[in-house]
């Protein structure tokens, strides 16, 4: 079974459900990621809520977090909140899920500075082949949703590929099938790759 790396559909049991700390209401049999979205970085007073939620055993990852140059608080504030998520990810030994818009330079600079031990997952990756290589070379996993660059999808190293739905109505297997076509491999092969990569990243039992 293919586990959805990132969704906002709280009814799912075959996915990592992304929620804000204020809305975190864990249910048995479900797995979550919790974080302060870059668009909400003006709300840093509830970081204490995040710290409490993140420690819950049903939380598989921290985020989504990152930097968005088109929306949210000023870049310095977003970067500061991003750094706090990194520290939390490292202290709890849970991977980090990234939301990044036109801020590749900041993300890579902070990663180089912080030297994190935990995996980073770039959710909803839509970049080109060059960007995919740059991120993969820096150890970042790339999660593809319903919109992606087909050449990039074909080029992502096998050990860096993940699949998600985010807020799309497209099913996870539908997206995986399109990725398989780009890579000229079978759907079961994509499912196996993505499942293994996610399991390794989050110690998640598929």
Where are these regions (language model features)?
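Mid-domain alpha/beta scaffold segments of enzyme catalytic cores
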Residues: 1-206
